[in-house]
């Protein structure tokens, strides 16, 4: 990924010089479902998949959320991550993740998407709900809306980082 002032390396390292990492069935799916920062990097522009999966559609309700597509793509499947940059991304102008309408759509559509998996993966969905709320709380903190920030942070995982956000939101 390349920004205006610095280059950020977002490529995983292969431990055995093969140049790729292999992930077991559902390993990437569960990592994405729980919004974990550990696991396969799945940047939208660099996901390569077999043509037999082209029937998996992007959501059309909001027209901008890829979370459900990623979940469907990796559910019950093995995957491979190429450990080299497939493209450089230039970031200019406005940042979509700071757009309130995008964040609101992402929040509600993420909850809708994970509800599909609630019966089969209850603890993972519960963890995902907390992380989605934490993300929304940190967004409102960054935007300066401390009341809304606290509302969502209180629904997230209570850990030191969350407590510090809550304390400094008053």
Where are these regions (language model features)?
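Catalytic core of nucleotide-sugar-dependent glycosyltransferases
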Residues: 85-93, 98-124, 146-156
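Positions in alpha-helical segments
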Residues: 56, 134-135
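Membrane-interface aromatic/basic loop that binds lipid-linked glycans or pyrophosphate carriers
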Residues: 140-170
């Amino acid at each position: 990924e390349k920004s205006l002032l610095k280059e950020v390396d977002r490529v995983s390292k292969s431990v055995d010089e093969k140049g790729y990492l292999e992930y077991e069935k559902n390993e990437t799916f569960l990592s994405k479902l729980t919004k974990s920062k550990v696991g396969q990097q799945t940047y939208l522009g660099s996901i390569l998949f077999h043509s037999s999966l082209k029937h998996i559609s992007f959501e059309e309700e909001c027209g901008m959320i890829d979370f459900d597509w990623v979940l469907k793509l990796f559910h019950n499947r093995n995957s491979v991550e190429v450990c080299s940059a497939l493209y450089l991304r230039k970031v200019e102008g406005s940042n979509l993740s700071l757009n309130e309408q995008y964040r609101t759509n992402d929040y509600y559509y993420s909850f809708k998407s994970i509800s599909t998996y609630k019966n089969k993966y209850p603890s993972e969905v519960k963890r995902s709900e907390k992380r989605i709320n934490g993300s929304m709380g940190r967004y409102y903190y960054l935007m300066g809306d401390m009341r809304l920030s606290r509302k969502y942070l209180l629904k997230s995982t209570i850990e030191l980082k969350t407590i510090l956000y809550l304390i400094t939101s008053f």
